């Protein structure tokens, strides 16, 4: 807004105040954000009108704008919370805690827990820090003093706290002056003009010769809806804002708006675009180059003329050949195994059979699909950790970080990679099969959700977006050119594009907002709601004239639409999706050849003609697709890559695509090497991209001494699933040839990192249950003596993240009161009892039992909040309902399951289905089921809405083994796969059908009975402990052993040689670190174990041998392993 328009707002504020429009004046203050009325703010705080206080503040700042703003909102919401507690309105206090204060837990989790603990006190003044809290009135006054200091110090309120000095009734004076001027221009001015309206200019026709007399109009008569004002600037008249921005309207003065952009990025246009000639705009992975010069037609259209142009005209579209449904790529040409779950794919912009693939293990791979050959693989590696932010360094211990997006630059010379934590990588691609490291940028705090290339002013740039709600633009030296703020949720996707000479970016966020940005510092130009109001991606047609978006709502409903750019409205909505998409994630889509739309849903690929909302065709691609497959067309539209459930992808082709692939025949890549090299115009010693410094700087570190080693090719795929049976192979002459796989064996303490928890006076003889806190900062162990012990890691220079780590020994934590979390034992020997424990999601409460009543402990004070369910029968397993911490499933000694409501202290229902005691319970939030396991080797499935039994499955025992002993169950991270653990086996079940997919039986070096096992944080590994002290680490896919940890690696010689020998009784996986786990031992000690920092992970993924690895049985082929459908990009 121009300075004169800003001043006009102040004039209106003065007028509203003088005319006593009290509510309106404060509404305008808030909406404009130009003047913060401290007096009004104080009145509302003193009155305790908290909703109005926050609403008024929202016009000037948001919670996460800066630390001052955060403190302001926190103090207000804390006061609101304390007042509810002081009124003993617990329901209101809980509501404030969950809705208003929860946002601060991400910034200070300990403080949020402490605030939560106030609910447990009869009078919150019992808290030492709040002991001096007086009455409500004095508390508000004290808080207001603090708020005023924060507001005055907050840079966002600078120059907004003082109203400008104005003469009284300044707006009335200006209007009177304008009317006098108009009256002077009257051809026949009347001596006493009658002013009846301000909506039109004044004119009068009095008798001949009358002189104009001054006009004075009382402004009280001025209607609140003002008319047209005289020009406020030398260039454009001030006009009321339109009802809502259109996708075209905000571009009307784009050329003028870009004049403030540095010339290195966007050159300002010297030709302003008339408002009625706004170019409509609203993701194409490849950004086409801009015209080298404006076309003659465009110059004519932009040149000022004597008559207006009603609408924008476009060059005639390029004639497209007729096409039919037979042109859809639906034939399976080949199936290729990537080796880990595929997260992103992109075909080369000019070499249409080169496919770039990104995976969950952080590896990028380039495939020549015509030869079914892997040209190179680059495993995840941080190039220069010292150049990264301390925040990333604290989380960079993971061996790999998943890839969110891979993409080619428009000319195919650069590869962009966006990772799920902080980083982007740029690689220079040198044909045929070499790459060079160009840039590593710590781009965003949290995940980098999307990456794309753009060319403002014909200069290649990289655009990124992330969880930190920002969109950033980088040049090829790693310098940040722009950082766009405005989204209120993590930014999910970006779509850079251009129309004529106007360059812009569309972005979408997880709250379903669509915003548009020019390359300037003026903020977003539009703000729309995407259909579904959740994850949405946007794409332009190949010719750049039509805009589409596809997204999914949180409820699983999917939307594919075409936009009317000029109006900002939806032009057509395509039908054919299921009401609720199968699987957890987001529907993916792509477009090709200006004719075809394709989306992956319901284990198939669906196609639409862009001009018809009815689904045209669909294909299951011979089966094996996930619920929501990812997909990508090549630029010719004759090949389509789609992901499969077994860590691979399929290439679908039409007749033209099949001819292209057959041209390769069975010839190896070497036969085509000369063709690739002849087409490359780059000299190997020259920079691939102009403007990239050949010297290695902070952002463009190059590791020339570490050639990337590709992952071994998986040969376990089912050959029958390939239409063209040609096995993948790697050139014999490659310098980075894959090494033979070897099982990682950790045999001594020098091969891993181990931290032993400090001993305590109440240490038990055994650790029978073990849990990490959900925040990852503590370990909770239940001993055979019925006492729970808690260890916490402190945040310090040695451990900046404050999370559990084997690098630092934590402290045994106890409250100042010295209380101990001692369970009721009901006069029984706790050594003979079946222990059970469960932790609430916010780490505030722990529930446990050890033969006696179930006790609910406060984790901060260790006080017993309540006890319930006295024996007999005794409780044997506990599980919180995932959606309601007040609902608990309790497994019992008598084989029943009690569904207990803590709030009303009542058993809602009893479930009967087992023959012996309950040993395991697991909820699936996605499938809405509870799975129970018992000492009878049975699995039962219960519907959580009706609590009816849906199914009962007997665990298949190895030959000669009796169906007895404890069985544990655990869901993976997306609740679709169930890990079943028994001393005789590890097994993975498809939870929706309760059918066993894989089974592993103890053998060879791991032949002892299994004592316990657990999924890793990301559910990609299984940590299993054995009664001889060995620990096995398995890949979830096929339950293949990738690492064995021998007892000497983590146990002392005394422990190994003791009688009986020491071994792990329980295993717990860290909730955030995928390769960290803890074990509770039979001697009462607890240890945290991690791989060496130089290794970063527990071995590598083993190859499949002859389809089924030794010792692992499967109920399906090696290619029928349905991977978890994670939230897809």
UniProtKB/Swiss-Prot annotation:
Biased composition (Low complexity): 1113-1129
Recorded consequence of changing residue 118 to A: Loss of interaction with EAR motif-containing full-length proteins
Pfam family, one: WD40
Free-text tissue specificity from the UniProt record: Expressed in panicles, stems, leaves, spikelets and seed endosperm.
GO biological-process terms attached to the record: positive regulation of pattern recognition receptor signaling pathway; regulation of DNA-templated transcription
GO-annotated molecular function: protein sequestering activity
GO cellular component: plasma membrane
SMART domains attached to this UniProt entry: CTLH, LisH, WD40
Ranges for the WD repeats: 337-377, 398-437, 443-485, 487-527, 579-618, 623-662, 762-801, 829-867, 870-910, 913-952, 1005-1044
Domain LisH: 4-36
Name of the protein this chain belongs to: Protein TPR1
Gene this chain is encoded by: TPR1
